[in-house]
Design a protein with these regions (language model features):
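FIC/Doc superfamily catalytic core
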Residues: 1-354
């Protein structure tokens, strides 16, 4: 299959320099030993930051504190739309984590699954590929203040082929993984295959490519946070000064390096932040986690670490300590809440295996 409608990237000196800088940080990060308990806490916090930041770009009004509270709330309660959006993104990140464990390749099905998670709770027409508009109506992204069409994406009939081209590109190209991630981000935003959730889906799928090729830095840090610092620059870089109509240049932009350089610059900042965080946060994060534990819970954690019990069942540990199974489960629950343990579901029994 030809991939005529996927942006072509020429590797300029600036692009190569940025890739080299990111690769250098990636190598440096690989030399840092971090205990699993610290990684788990940092990953959870990073997913929260990404969920908040990615939705903030789209105009979600929640503060970061409110977003975190929504993520941590009982899933059975009723959520307002902004809260549901943040929760959806967090769950989509968890979903992609599971895909990554299986090393699932990038596919159209994966894109559709992710968008359905992003739009969970929305009306049916907002989930899945957009269809034809009523006669006399134009599908476009409009400026909320002026009402002018900011972007007119491709016709709905072209979307399946454009997505097929993107999937073909991702799975056959020999481009550098950072370039692939940038291209996926641009193409999904530009193809605009859905009625809603395009930007969030693009950021999630681009992030999956980074994770797949080892540029997600173990899930630590938030790239979305850097995009959210200046949404105007983010959108301007995607638009590249081109006309609003997709068919008038955005399908084959003359200067794709505008977007690529922006994306790599954000990646560079992100990689530096992750490196600094990984170098300095070990003791701070552990101290912060332990401050929420009482003496018995700290003693329990120390026991697990001393005995190198990185995987265990509560019943096993209860026998070792001479306490009830319920006591161990209660202590495990507190450690789970503080990101110090990860429950693994075996068959139907939650907490039947704990991984520290």
């Amino acid at each position: 299959m030809e991939v005529d409608h996927v942006i072509k990237v020429t590797l300029t000196n600036e692009i190569l320099k940025r890739i080299s800088e990111i690769d250098e940080k990636r190598f440096s990060l690989s030399t840092i030993e971090m205990p699993p308990v610290i990684k788990n806490r940092l990953r959870k916090n990073s997913k929260k930051k990404s969920s908040y930041a990615s939705n903030k770009i789209e105009g979600n009004p929640l503060t970061e504190k409110q977003a975190n509270e929504a993520i941590d709330s009982d899933p059975h309660k009723h959520f307002l739309k902004p809260e549901q959006e943040v929760r959806n993104y967090f769950l989509a990140l968890n979903f992609l984590e599971e895909k990554l464990k299986k090393k699932e390749v990038f596919s159209k099905e994966m894109i559709l699954e992710v968008q359905a998670m992003v739009e969970k709770g929305a009306s049916k027409e907002k989930i899945g590929l957009r269809g034809p508009m009523p006669p006399g109506m134009l599908f476009a992204v409009y400026d909320s203040e002026t009402g002018a069409a900011e972007y007119i994406p491709p016709e709905y009939i072209d979307i399946p082929d454009l997505l097929d081209e993107l999937v073909e590109y991702v799975n056959t190209t020999d481009d550098h993984p950072l370039i692939i991630a940038a291209v996926v981000h641009y193409q999904l935003v530009t193809i605009h295959p859905f009625e809603d959730g395009n930007g969030r889906t693009a950021r999630l799928m681009s992030g999956y490519i980074l994770d797949y090729y080892g540029y997600g830095f173990n899930g630590i840090g938030s790239l979305e946070e850097y995009f959210a610092y200046d949404p105007d620059e983010y959108y301007a870089s995607l638009q590249m000064g081109l006309p609003a109509l997709y068919y008038s240049g955005r399908e084959n932009p003359p200067h794709p390096e505008i977007w690529i350089n922006y994306f790599l610059r954000m990646m560079e900042l992100y990689s530096k932040k992750v490196y600094e965080l990984s170098k300095t946060s070990e003791n701070d994060e552990l101290d912060g986690s332990l401050s929420y534990l009482n003496a018995k819970e700290k003693e329990f954690l120390a026991f697990l670490l001393k005995k190198r019990l990185y995987e265990f069942t509560p019943i096993e540990v209860s026998k070792m300590l001479g306490v009830t199974n319920k006591t161990i489960i209660n202590r495990c629950a507190k450690l789970v809440n503080n990101g110090l343990l990860i429950p693994i579901i075996v068959k139907t029994r939650v907490l039947s295996l704990i991984h520290i």
